[in-house]
Amino acid sequence: MKKIISIKGTEKEVIEICERISKMGIDYSFDAKANYSENKAYNSARIKIFGEDKNKLVEDYKNILSIIEHVHNKYNVDVKGLYEYKLSDLKYPVNKDLVLDTLSALKINFKYLKDENVIKCELKVEELNDILKNILEIYSELNVYKLGSKPVKNVLALASYITGNDVNILLEKGLEKELFREENEKIVLNKDIDLTRKELLSVKK
């Protein structure tokens, strides 16, 4: 038995769909070709999936359709101008809270769907990855400081990225304003995290 699925998209979309299907461990074939329309290149492909078990074949078919939809939404905006991707699609291992705080601080139009762990965002995934690369570099530098908790690291990394200030300056300002305090040889939060974030994001360079 077999089922056939036809798809069309950019080369990047078709390649990613193929890569994701290849990890499913199913019996399939994949034929693609490039096409040109109005000076724009796109790829079309035919996916054939095979199986002796009808129920398994139907399940694989549905899973592939889900992959196609996911990849399409990742690279194409919806009617509201938003791309849709999972946190696992992001290239850099920045924690969820810091990702969402960064989007909010940059006043980016986005929604986070908690149950699906999905972000709907006006930024392309590549654009968000560029931002997160810089955030992660700052976050990694915080390892030399004795910081008490993830929220402290998050707020310092975010404030440093947004304001352009060195982490040392932000730590000093935070201690001066009693946003942080020293406890057991570590710097910990002393005020509400939202207040701390607001204050540090307002520090001028």
From Swiss-Prot:
InterPro entries referenced in this protein's UniProt entry, alphabetically: DUF2067
Database matches in Pfam families: DUF2067
Superkingdom classification of source: Archaea
Protein name: Uncharacterized protein Mevan_1275
